[in-house]
């Protein structure tokens, strides 16, 4: 699963996401993309599940790029622990995804297969998504 090798601070405050994506909202590498229609945090496990679903569908035919990276730590205290005694340990890593962010890209396969693969990946994610083609975004 994806996670940062080294971070400046181990723990971070939750924060909030708002607005549309200013960066990462165009297809840069492939021909097809999966764009977020909602704002949310996506876990490293969800990204990995989507990646596996796509690569299994396209077999060895094409190439997949993951355009988001989980670099926000999510902490959690153990079950049945009293309040206090400091912030909990890092439970998992999240990737911030704003409306309009291109999350995955794909190339080297026909459009119908790419759409099916992206649909499978979309079902693994907690946000509504849209399949886009590079020629549509120009």
Swiss-Prot record:
Coiled coil: none annotated. It comes from Borrelia garinii subsp. bavariensis (strain ATCC BAA-2496 / DSM 23469 / PBi) (Borreliella bavariensis). Residues 1-21 are annotated as: Disordered. GO terms for biological process: translation. InterPro entries: Ribosomal_uL16, Ribosomal_uL16_bact-type, Ribosomal_uL16_CS, Ribosomal_uL16_dom, Ribosomal_uL16_sf. Keywords: Ribonucleoprotein, Ribosomal protein, RNA-binding, rRNA-binding, tRNA-binding. Residues 1-15 have a biased composition (Basic residues). HAMAP family: Ribosomal_uL16 (MF_01342). The gene is rplP. This is Large ribosomal subunit protein uL16. NCBIfam families: rplP_bact. Pfam families: Ribosomal_L16 (PF00252). GO terms for molecular function: rRNA binding; structural constituent of ribosome; tRNA binding. The keyword Ribonucleoprotein applies. Belongs to the universal ribosomal protein uL16 family. Binds 23S rRNA and is also seen to make contacts with the A and possibly P site tRNAs. Part of the 50S ribosomal subunit. Disulfide bonds: none annotated. GO terms for cellular component: cytosolic large ribosomal subunit.
């Amino acid at each position: 699963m994806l996670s940062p090798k080294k971070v400046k601070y181990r723990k971070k405050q939750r924060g909030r996401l708002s607005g549309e994506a200013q960066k990462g909202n165009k297809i840069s590498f492939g021909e097809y993309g999966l764009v977020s229609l909602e704002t949310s945090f996506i876990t490293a496990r969800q990204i990995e599940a989507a990646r596996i679903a796509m690569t299994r569908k396209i077999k060895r035919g094409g190439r997949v790029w993951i355009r988001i990276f989980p670099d926000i730590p999510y902490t959690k205290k153990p079950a049945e622990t009293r309040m206090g005694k400091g912030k909990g340990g890092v439970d998992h890593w999240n990737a911030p995804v704003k409306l309009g962010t291109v999350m995955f890209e794909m190339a080297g396969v026909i459009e119908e297969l790419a759409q099916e693969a992206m649909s499978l990946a979309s079902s693994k994610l907690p946000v509504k998504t849209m399949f886009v083609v590079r020629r549509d975004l120009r």
